[in-house]
Every structure is written in C-alpha cells, then in structure tokens.
Regions:
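Short beta-strand segments
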Residues: 8-9, 123-125
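Short flexible coil/turn linkers enriched for glycine and charged/polar residues
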Residues: 42, 115-117, 139
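Short, low-complexity, glycine-enriched hydrophobic/amphipathic alpha-helices that associate
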Residues: 55-101
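Membrane-engaging insertion elements
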Residues: 86-124
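Conserved, surface-exposed functional patches that form binding/active-site neighborhoods
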Residues: 111, 126, 132-135
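Terminal membrane-proximal soluble interaction domains of membrane-associated proteins
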Residues: 124, 137-151
Length: 207
C-alpha cells in the first residue's frame, strides 16, 4: 500500500538530514521511498527547500504522478492557510470547510500542526511493515502524520473543489463591497452637491 508520510521538524537542519538520508538510501528491506519534498512555512506561505524522485515505481504510478505536488499546492494555498489560521479575515466565512474536508484529513492536520519557521517533509513510500519510516525518523524532534495515498488523492480533489467555492464566495463578497463603496461615494457626492447648492442659495438670498 502506498502511503504519504508527513514529518514536521522543529529544527530545519534535521529536516535536511532526514531528506538526505532517504535520498541516499531510498530502498531497504523495510521500506521504499519513491518521492519526497522538504518545504518550509515562512510568512504564512510554503517554500520548497529540496526534493528528490527516485523513479522507483509505486503500486499505482498514475496516482503517484502529481500527488506530492498537489498536496504541497493545497497546503500552501487558500485552504491550507485558512485551516492553519493564516487567513484570519476569512475565518468567519459562511463557507464551511467541514463540509468538504473530514476532521481527520491530512490536509487539516498538517495545516494545523506546521508553524511559521518549521519545515515539513512529505514522502511517498511503501513499507514492508507499518511504522518502519516512523521508527527511522524517531531520532529527530518530529511530528508524523501517515495517510493512505489513495485517500490523500481524494482529499486533494475535495480541497480543489473547496478552493473553487471559496474563490467564488470571495469574489461575490468583493463585488458586494465594491458596490457598497460606490454607493457610499455617490451618496457623498450628492451631499457635497447639495451643500454647494444650499451655499449658493444662501448667497443669492443674502444679496
């Protein structure tokens, strides 16, 4: 079974070390790592630090194709930032992410766990026995989330739909705000014109 292993490191150098060790020895008698990427959360965005692709086939190579890239894209996009609390202005949105993502989803877990300045390694792997990669990474100060790769693919599809809904709502709110702003400006101009007319009338009556 293909798995997505997400490891969040408190110390950046440990993240680099973990990725390097897997890159140097991606296939053992305990596990096989096909792809991995190291990202860092900075200024509420995600930057890719390093990555590798061994070319080793997974049990579902079609599924594996853009899986890690898709997950990174979601985590660094509006949904990931909203779940991680980076889009404070939208947290009161009427759009309920709970309708789109399960509370136990990897997207929600990782978005909530990774803090600004921390690094995260995401790996696509197969294990001969459960917990083999966790055991290897346990020497680091790390928090690990494991998910079935097929389930992650489904989560990504749901998150993409949620992003589209969020974008539609944001556009609608922006248009409404622009209409309200225009209405206020028109009303302000009317008041200014009326004040000017009253001023002229007052001068005429005085003369």
């Amino acid at each position: 079974m293909d798995k997505i292993i997400t490891a969040i490191f408190k110390v950046e150098s440990e993240g680099y070390q973990a990725l390097t060790e897997l890159k140097q020895n991606p296939e053992t008698d305990k596990y096989v790592v096909s792809q991995a990427v190291l990202i860092k959360k900075e200024n509420n965005g995600l930057n890719t630090l390093d990555s590798f692709d061994t070319g080793i086939e997974t049990s579902n190579d079609t599924l594996a194709g853009g899986l890690i890239g898709g997950l990174v894209g979601i985590l660094g996009g509006p949904i990931g930032m909203l779940l991680g609390g980076s889009l404070g202005a939208l947290t009161g949105s009427v759009f309920d992410l709970g309708d789109a993502l399960d509370n136990e989803s990897i997207i929600e877990k990782v978005s909530d766990m990774i803090m600004d300045g921390e690094v995260c390694m995401i790996a696509l792997a197969q294990e001969k026995e459960p917990g083999q990669l966790q055991q290897k990474l346990s020497k680091f100060n790390v928090s690990i989330v494991e998910s079935n790769a097929a389930e992650v693919e489904e989560e990504i599809e749901q998150a993409i739909k949620a992003e589209k809904e969020l974008e539609k709502e944001a556009r609608a709110k922006l248009r409404e705000a622009q209409k309200e702003d225009l209405k206020n400006k028109v009303e302000e101009k009317k008041q200014q014109l009326q004040a000017g007319i009253e001023e002229v009338k007052a001068k005429v009556n005085k003369d």
